């Protein structure tokens, strides 16, 4: 009996082991998530795993970063090469064609193996932001019906706006008032002299002033997992990789948007006032989050064949890099 009491006492003295934290991409989709939303999340999460799960934490700091866009390194499956995967995002989303006037684009359309075309393509991948190509690739892989594939995020933001309250496959919503859900996209405006927020974006879209505005969108893969009041997003070409971002949610499930300042509105990854002496200015989540694209489609496009050739987007060739 004394021995049993001794064991119990020793057990109480043992340090508590930390609970295993769940990975947002490893949790099965909750009840009620549509089939197309499941497909979008699965495609985005699959790519995030390939890139060794880098992420930006709730404080807007890069907490982990593995291989990057132009490296000749294997991804997590030990088969795909990093730069070739990015070239695949361009090719397989039908967004490479509109970039044809830009040096190196034609080389990315060629099979890998030639030293000249490989180097030319890798230079193209470095010089031309591929985040919209990544989004378009995910939507293609998930067979989202009617999605506007484009090398510019603003094109599908505009399409969601033009669709109105019944827009398909996405409708435009205010991220400050509507709750994000898996399969949605959250977007910010960049390289502007001042912040606009949702109201300013709506005014600009209504007057036709958005043109080739620079913007950036990321895919919602989980929201408030286990009541943690955290939004989990995945985007491409974030720190030159496929990165997960964490944002805080309020008690109602709406995003607690970090307030953008003049510095973060005019830059994308590196904030102007961020320095070792001013750590409080270093927050990659402090952006002009102006658009929440709510997924309205519920079922993937019928008879989808991921290996079939895709028609090019309706956009004209783009003479200069225009997207992030």
Language-model features: where?
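...with weaker cross-activation on analogous glycine-rich loops/strands in unrelated enzymes
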Residues: 150-239
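Bacterial N-terminal signal peptides that target proteins for export
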Residues: 1-7
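N-terminal capping segments
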Residues: 22-142, 288, 293-324
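Surface-exposed intrinsically disordered loops and tails
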Residues: 71-76, 83, 92-120, 162-170, ...
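Bacterial N-terminal signal peptides
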Residues: 7-16
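Low-complexity, Gly/Ser/Thr/Pro-rich intrinsically disordered linker/tail segments
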Residues: 240-324
């Amino acid at each position: 009996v004394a021995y049993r009491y001794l064991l119990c006492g020793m057990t109480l003295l043992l340090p508590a082991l930390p609970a295993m934290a769940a990975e947002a991409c490893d949790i099965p989709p909750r009840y009620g998530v549509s089939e197309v939303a499941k497909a979008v999340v699965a495609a985005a999460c699959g790519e995030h795993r390939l890139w060794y799960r880098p992420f930006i934490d709730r404080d807007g700091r890069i907490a982990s970063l593995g291989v990057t866009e132009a490296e000749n390194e294997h991804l997590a499956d030990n088969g795909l090469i990093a730069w070739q995967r990015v070239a695949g995002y361009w090719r397989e989303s039908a967004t490479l064609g509109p970039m044809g006037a830009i040096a190196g684009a034609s080389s990315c359309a060629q099979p890998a193996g030639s030293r000249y075309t490989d180097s030319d393509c890798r230079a193209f991948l470095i010089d031309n932001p591929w985040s919209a190509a990544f989004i378009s690739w995910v939507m293609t892989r998930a067979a989202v019906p009617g999605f506007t594939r484009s090398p510019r995020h603003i094109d599908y933001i505009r399409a969601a706006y033009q669709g109105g309250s019944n827009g398909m496959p996405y409708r435009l919503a205010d991220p400050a008032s509507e709750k994000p859900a898996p399969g949605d996209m959250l977007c910010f405006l960049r390289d502007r002299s001042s912040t606009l927020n949702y109201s300013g974006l709506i005014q600009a879209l209504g007057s036709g002033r958005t043109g080739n505005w620079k913007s950036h969108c990321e895919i919602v893969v989980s929201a408030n997992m286990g009541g943690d009041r955290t939004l989990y997003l995945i985007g491409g070409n974030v720190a030159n990789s496929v990165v997960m971002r964490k944002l805080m949610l309020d008690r109602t499930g709406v995003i607690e948007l970090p307030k953008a300042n003049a510095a973060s509105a005019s830059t994308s990854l590196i904030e102007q006032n961020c320095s070792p002496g001013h750590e409080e200015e270093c927050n990659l989540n402090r952006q002009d989050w102006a658009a929440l694209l709510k997924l309205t489609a519920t079922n993937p496009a019928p008879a989808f064949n991921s290996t079939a050739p895709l028609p090019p987007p309706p956009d004209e060739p783009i003479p200069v890099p225009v997207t992030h």
